[in-house]
């Protein structure tokens, strides 16, 4: 180790050049940075940075190896475990999957009641379902919730004595759940009403939160922390509407690429939403949540789905179920960062159409 003693520093217009550099704690204060798809194999020194362009990961070199640096932001409305419930099957079973690992679904527990065509949303730790039709086609004003980390049956923690809804859609930003549209009767009374639930630990009741730009049912929704989007629906054109979690109402902003008939399944991350577009049984569209721009094509599902459910971990979306040719148990997945067609994920425990899904930890 060397000792450097400085008595006087004078401004002579040129910098002092230390031939062997300066080390602080064994590392140079001047660090190299490399962005590449493969790890730098030579010339690495403690403190050097490498950005892995192929996997969007960041590393720093210490003790003869690159160590990953991660900053994991809290995810308030998605997570590692996806849960699918409801649907037209006469079964109370809730299915769950680990979204990062392809495979068949497993029994999570039982729903609080048997309903299809309800809405689903997540605050990151709990999943919520509201509304729907029972086997007698009676529209419900009740809902239920589960805790993602604990397998078991759902409990009744959400509802609205003034509004029964089926074939609506839901989303959540941790603080609030937004429910839009749907029908108050079986195939009748399609509405443009928006309901808002304040997320609390106990029972949650809805309050009126304005109206959408059009009546809708069978539509899909996704959101970031401040803004939510609704995607089309049977009783509308291929429109995209936007609303705020803190200001009532939602209005038209853009268009889907397809006809938007009953997209039902949408998910994404904190920047982008991907929705089943409704043009065929396979078309997927994508939008940037904060932009007022028309959707663009993302790709195709690998199997025909119609009225699927969706869940996401922020990197991958799994679409499940549907009714293209009878009730389906297929699941397909896409990677949010990469446009293209989906891949087979596995099977639900039961075939179901109009199932709804959400995810959390």
Where are these regions (language model features)?
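Polar, enzyme-active/binding microenvironments
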Residues: 2-361
């Amino acid at each position: 180790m060397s000792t450097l003693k400085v008595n006087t520093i004078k401004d002579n217009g040129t910098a002092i050049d230390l031939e062997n550099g300066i080390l602080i704690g064994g590392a140079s204060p001047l660090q190299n940075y490399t962005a590449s798809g493969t790890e730098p194999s030579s010339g690495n020194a403690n403190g050097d940075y490498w950005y892995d362009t192929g996997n969007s990961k960041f590393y720093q070199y210490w003790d003869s190896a690159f160590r990953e640096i991660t900053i994991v932001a809290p995810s308030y409305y998605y997570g590692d475990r996806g849960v699918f419930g409801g649907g037209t099957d006469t079964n109370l079973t809730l299915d769950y999957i680990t979204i990062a690992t392809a495979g068949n679904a497993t029994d999570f527990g039982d729903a609080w009641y048997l309903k299809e065509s309800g809405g689903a949303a997540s605050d990151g730790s709990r999943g919520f379902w509201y509304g729907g039709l029972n086997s007698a086609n009676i529209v419900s004003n009740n809902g239920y919730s589960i805790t993602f980390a604990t397998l078991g049956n759902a409990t009744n923690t959400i509802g609205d004595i003034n509004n029964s809804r089926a074939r609506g859609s839901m989303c959540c930003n941790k603080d609030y759940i937004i429910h839009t549209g749907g029908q108050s009767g079986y195939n009748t009374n399609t509405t443009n009403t928006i309901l808002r639930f304040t997320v609390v630990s106990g029972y949650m009741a809805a309050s009126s939160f304005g109206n959408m730009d059009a009546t809708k049912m069978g539509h899909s929704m996704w959101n970031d922390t401040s803004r939510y989007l609704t995607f089309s629906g049977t009783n509308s054109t291929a429109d995209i509407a936007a609303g705020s979690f803190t200001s009532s109402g939602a209005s038209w902003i853009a268009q889907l690429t397809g006809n938007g008939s009953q997209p039902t399944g949408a998910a994404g991350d904190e920047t982008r939403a991907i929705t089943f577009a409704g043009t065929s049984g396979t078309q997927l569209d994508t939008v940037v949540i904060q932009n007022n721009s028309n959707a663009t094509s993302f790709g195709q599902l690998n199997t025909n789905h119609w009225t699927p459910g969706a869940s996401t971990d922020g990197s991958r979306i799994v679409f499940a179920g549907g009714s293209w040719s009878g009730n389906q148990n297929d699941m397909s997945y896409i990677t949010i960062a990469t446009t293209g067609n989906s891949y087979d994920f596995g099977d639900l425990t039961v075939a179901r159409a109009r199932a709804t899904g959400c995810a959390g930890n």
